[in-house]
Amino acid sequence: MSNANFSILVDFAAGGLVLASVLIVWRRDLRAIVRLLAWQGAALAAIPLLRGIRDNDRALIAVGIAVLALRALVLPWLLARAVGAEAAAQREATPLVNTASSLLITAGLTLTAFAITQPVVNLEPGVTINAVPAAFAVVLIALFVMTTRLHAVSQAAGFLMLDNGIAATAFLLTAGVPLIVELGASLDVLFAVIVIGVLTGRLRRIFGDADLDKLRELRD
């Protein structure tokens, strides 16, 4: 693979990560959010896969395949099951920040990410380093989602976005994350999603809803 093609494809993957994050902020349908997470996982997996193919590095290719399986298939499937079990609430409740304001804040966070990471890009410009601002933007957007969404599944989606952004930053800044490290991190995330799914199910059975704002009202 030529450097020109590699650069274009990495930019597409990084752009896909940010686009999926912005669409998750925009959407309120929980099923759509899960599908977008799956697409974001595929965009994340493309980064080590492309690097492995270009460098003929089988370990990186294996990491990319593992990321694709876990982030684009297994974890979204677990979240989809949690959403499917809640037939009465397929949409996110009114968030703390409305959609228009959320999109404006997301744009601001993206610009902030590019400003913060610009010194890193200038220090050692390169094909993958140039895409680091996009990965860091995903981290900031994920933190915003986690603090403004009220549904347990939406907050779990924000947590997965955060992990995707951190993993993308690691893939872009280094020569690649060793397979055992990536598997360990992914298994931690998998465990967290399983726990969130179990807790969401129990909240739904006991209180009839998994909306955290409504649960606070019950407590009060």
UniProtKB/Swiss-Prot annotation:
Q: Other notes on this protein?
A: Was identified as a high-confidence drug target.
Name of this chain's protein = Uncharacterized protein Rv0085
List UniProt keywords, sorted A-Z: Cell membrane, Membrane, Transmembrane, Transmembrane helix
Q: Name one GO cellular component term.
A: plasma membrane
- Cysteine-cysteine disulfides: none
Annotated source species: Mycobacterium tuberculosis (strain ATCC 25618 / H37Rv)
Task: Extract the PANTHER family matched here.
Answer: HYDROGENASE-4 COMPONENT E
Where in or outside the cell it occurs: the entry states: Cell membrane
Q: How does it sit in the membrane?
A: Multi-pass membrane protein
Report which superkingdom the organism of origin falls in. Bacteria
Any signal peptide, and if so, which residues?
A: none
Q: Which InterPro entries match?
A: HyfE-like
Membrane spanning segments where? 6-26, 33-53, 59-79, 103-123, 126-146, 157-177, 179-199
